[in-house]
């Protein structure tokens, strides 16, 4: 019997991450990179672990504080924070920020998720698919000061979010988004990085020509809304891409 090729990959042992959520006492400064200041508990919990990452976060923090104004947010509104230094990236948003947003929404359903910039505006659709409608953005070019913010932990390491939590996020999205698989998965999809910010495929035209022989479709997910992406993946039998 031929062993499935995926069996050659070793399973990695890691502690699955589930974000803790809580209300911070007093007034806290929140930067556009998601660092929480003035808190012995929440400042380290808002940054990934690892020396080189923390050095980079410190550089970004100092630059941000030196160049951006500080705006006090309304005291009569409860704000939740779910972003970090890397969550403008789609992978980190889906696997880190969405679980954090769900944790806040379940514990504090009246909290408004506060996102740091217009770069995140296209992510609002993913929050609505979780049933989160109250979404706001940092004032343009600013860091913010918030009284008693609702905070969620940043993962210590990348790619460690609890699989059970990710499945919960997925199931809620499918339910709230009213997604139904009307057809069995029958597509072979190749996700191109042609419109990505980096990690381009040097021989992509040749690769796409070869995949076309197997009736694979080449797509740029940047051209699809979130709901369109979910619908496409429901039709996908074989997915091909890189990270």
Residue map of PLM features:
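The feature primarily captures lumenal catalytic ectodomains
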Residues: 1-243
């Amino acid at each position: 019997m031929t062993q499935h090729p995926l069996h050659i990959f070793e399973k990695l042992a890691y502690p699955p991450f589930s974000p803790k959520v809580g209300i911070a006492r007093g007034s806290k400064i929140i930067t556009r990179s998601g660092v929480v200041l003035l808190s012995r508990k929440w400042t380290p919990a808002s940054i990934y672990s690892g020396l080189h990452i923390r050095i980079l976060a410190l550089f970004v923090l100092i630059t941000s504080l030196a160049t951006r104004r500080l705006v006090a947010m309304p005291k009569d509104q409860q704000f939740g924070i779910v972003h970090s230094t890397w969550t403008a990236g789609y992978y980190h948003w889906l696997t880190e920020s969405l679980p954090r947003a769900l944790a806040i929404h379940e514990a504090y359903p009246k909290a408004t998720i506060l996102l740091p910039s217009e770069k995140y505006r296209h992510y609002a659709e993913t929050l609505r698919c979780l049933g989160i409608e109250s979404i706001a953005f940092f004032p343009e070019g600013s860091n913010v000061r918030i009284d008693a913010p609702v905070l969620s932990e940043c993962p210590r390491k990348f790619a460690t979010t609890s699989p059970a939590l990710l499945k919960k996020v997925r199931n809620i999205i499918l339910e709230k988004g009213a997604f139904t698989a009307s057809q069995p998965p029958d597509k072979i999809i190749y996700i191109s990085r042609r419109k990505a910010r980096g990690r381009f495929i040097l021989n992509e035209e040749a690769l796409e020509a070869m995949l076309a022989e197997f009736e694979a479709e080449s797509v740029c997910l940047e051209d699809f809304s979130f709901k369109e992406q979910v619908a496409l993946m429901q039709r996908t039998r074989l997915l091909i891409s890189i990270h």
